[in-house]
From Swiss-Prot:
Segments carrying motif DDXXD motif: 335-339
Transit peptide: 1-31
Name of the protein in its database record: Probable monoterpene synthase MTS1, chloroplastic
Molecular-function GO term, any one: terpene synthase activity
EC number: 4.2.3.-
Sequence ranges of Polar residues compositional bias: 15-25
Region (Disordered): 1-29
UniProt domain comment: The Asp-Asp-Xaa-Xaa-Asp/Glu (DDXXD/E) motif is important for the catalytic activity, presumably through binding to Mg(2+).
Tissue expression summary: Expressed in trichomes. Detected in flowers, but not in leaves.
Binding site for Mg(2+) 2: 335, 339
Cofactor list: Mg(2+); Mn(2+)
Cofactor binding: number and manner: Binds 3 Mg(2+) or Mn(2+) ions per subunit.
Pfam family, one: Terpene_synth
Length: 585
């Protein structure tokens, strides 16, 4: 089998007529997704100026990194809270990845001295330490919060809403999202802190009151409102950095100008790198002419690229981001072929063609499937060729199997649609964690970023281990909460919300609450996998699986940011991340 690229014109069957028929002379009625066109066209993406590329900016970045390293080394060891606050600030500014060794050294000391800590009566310090230790994979027990519970009624102690207390409640709230299954004390902490933070916000906004019982720092209420909207642990790192850089720059007392300048330059440099990536993938998209030949599909190049950035945001992973974007675009096309456009007979033909994986046997495919198959064949085989050169292992058969699994899961849903079948929630999710194609994307990520690659590791990936399943399930549920109403309007299958309604006889609002709770519970499982050391996967790969879900939380936070409502909140976030640099002096 050749791994060389095949021209997109190869094997394309001529269209028998302008109107598709089912082989019996009857016209086929196609559904429509009613998708809006792309927000950014080829000319716009190619015109991006990449203002912050160049050696001068890199030299400035490296100089500032050196200064920050010195600061971290000089942090007073007798003040672990100051160390924790520095680490937290670096993380939120999006620059902690430059200082992993220094941060690990500081946290090792803090973790080893846990028995001697003096934070037992400080909810802010205790929660901050707990959050950061779990964030960086340390073993830390939730019982540390028992000291803040009332000995009589066993609930958390209530104190007046002074500024320091609100900081403590915010810290407790953020820490609670790192909980594991069965840690009821963190469930209680989340409920308790949420209630008090909501009360604090109401007090601040009540006639713009600045009562003496409430802290007068506007920065604090901004942080609280932002956290209540979505906790930091669930947010995409790069976009979180852009938002926090702006907030941090306005602080009066505890702003570190070196941290700020480094974060600004780092963000702009990465943005320029992303712009070059976008130029590359937009040229590929234009050359393939897939958008022209498959006009019924979503043209979501930039949105797909966002998810590639969520997976690997560092500058050195441009090769992986570009290929992951191509894979994501092809997956989007396949999703629309199966969900919207193709008939059952056509879908079976495509499935058979992927099973054969032979460019010379496409005669039975409709024309629109021909061009899709050849584009997919070229990209997948190109990745396999690169892996063969670097790792001396031929992985085409594994990539084909992964793609086939996705096709089979799509076919299950197509059959549900045509038969009018509503599955149970368990049945839906068992299939849906594959049909969302997150495991497929993660398998490609593994191949693009791992060396060496072995036959055993590929076989293990295709058994869909826990980390792939959790990432797929979370993405599926988050997607469904945002998109199910729009998809039902065009006649799609019931999603998780409707499956649970049908199964349990509850109303839609109750079903949505159940799915939200299921998302929270699944995150707890993800948290446990994060801190468990895998013998087969690097911690970086596991973090990428978590980051994929964070990308979903961004796209679907306020509606279908990938489909029918991609010109709303999601658009603003994409513009902020990819097209608007941070002004610097």
């Amino acid at each position: 089998m050749s791994l060389s690229g095949v021209p997109l014109s190869a094997g394309l069957a001529p269209s028998p007529s302008n109107k598709p028929t089912n082989g019996k002379g009857q016209n086929i009625v196609r559904r429509s997704g009613n998708y809006k066109p792309a927000l950014w066209d080829y000319d716009y993406l190619q015109s991006l100026p990449t203002l912050y590329a160049g050696e001068a900016h890199v030299e400035k970045l490296n100089k500032l990194k050196g200064e920050v390293r010195i600061m971290l080394e000089k942090t007073v060891t007798e003040n672990p809270l100051a160390q924790l606050e520095q680490i937290d600030t670096l993380y939120r500014l999006g620059i902690s990845y430059h200082f992993q060794d220094e941060i690990k050294a500081l946290l090792n000391t803090i973790h080893n001295n846990n028995n001697n800590n003096n934070n037992n009566d400080d909810v802010y310090a205790t929660a901050l330490e707990f959050k950061l230790l779990r964030l960086y994979g340390y073993t830390v027990h939730s019982e540390v919060f028992n000291v803040f519970k009332d000995e009589i009624d066993k609930g958390f102690k209530a104190i007046s809403l002074c500024g320091d207390y609100v900081k403590g409640m915010l810290s407790l709230y953020e820490a609670s999202f790192y909980s594991f299954k069965g840690e009821t004390i963190l469930d209680e902490a989340r409920d308790f802190s949420t209630k008090h933070l909501q009360k604090y916000v109401m007090m601040r906004h009540n006639n713009n009151s600045k009562d003496q019982s409430v802290d007068d720092d506007d920065d604090l209420v901004i942080l609280v409102e932002y956290a209540l909207e979505l906790p930091m642990h669930w947010r995409m790192i790069r976009l979180e950095a852009k938002w926090f850089i702006d907030v941090y720059s306005k602080r009066r007392d505890d702003m570190n100008p070196t941290f700020l300048e480094l974060a600004q330059i780092d963000f702009n440099l990465l943005q320029s790198t992303y712009q070059e990536d976008l130029k590359h993938v937009s040229r590929w998209w234009s050359t393939c002419k897939l958008g022209e030949r498959l006009p019924f599909c979503r043209d979501r190049l930039v949105e797909v690229f966002l998810l590639a950035v969520a997976l690997k945001y560092e500058a050195e992973f441009g090769y992986a981001r570009r290929l992951l974007t191509k894979i994501g675009v092809l997956v989007t096309l396949m999703d629309d072929i199966y969900d919207v456009y193709g008939t059952l007979d056509e879908l079976k033909l495509l499935e058979d063609a992927i099973e054969r994986w032979n460019i010379n046997e496409l005669d039975q495919l409709p024309e629109y499937m021909n061009i899709f198959f050849v584009a997919m064949y070229n990209v997948v085989n190109g990745i396999a060729y690169d892996v063969l050169k670097e790792n001396e292992i031929l992985i085409v058969k594994y990539l084909k199997r992964a793609w086939m699994d996705a096709c089979k899961s799509y076919m299950v849903e197509a059959k549900w649609y045509y038969s009018g079948y509503t599955p149970s929630l368990e049945e839906y999710l068992e299939n849906g964690l594959i049909s969302i194609t997150i495991p497929l994307d993660l398998i490609f990520l593994y191949c693009l970023t791992t060396s060496p690659i072995t036959e055993d590791s590929m076989e293990y990936l295709l058994q869909y281990p826990t980390i792939l399943g959790l990432s797929g399930t979370l993405f599926r549920l988050v997607d469904d909460l945002a998109t199910s109403s729009d998809e039902l309007k065009r006649g799609d299958n019931p999603k998780s919300i409707q499956c649970y309604m049908h199964e349990s006889g509850v109303c839609e609002n109750d079903s949505r609450e159940y799915i939200k709770n299921l998302i929270s519970e699944t995150w707890k499982q993800m948290n446990e996998v994060r801190v468990a050391k895998s013998p087969l996967f690097s911690q970086a790969f596991i973090e990428s699986a978590v980051d994929f879900v964070r990308g979903a939380m961004l796209l679907y936070q306020k509606g279908d940011g990938f489909g029918t409502k991609h010109d709303g909140d999601a658009k603003d976030k994409l513009v902020s991340l990819f097209f608007n640099p941070i002004p610097t002096p």
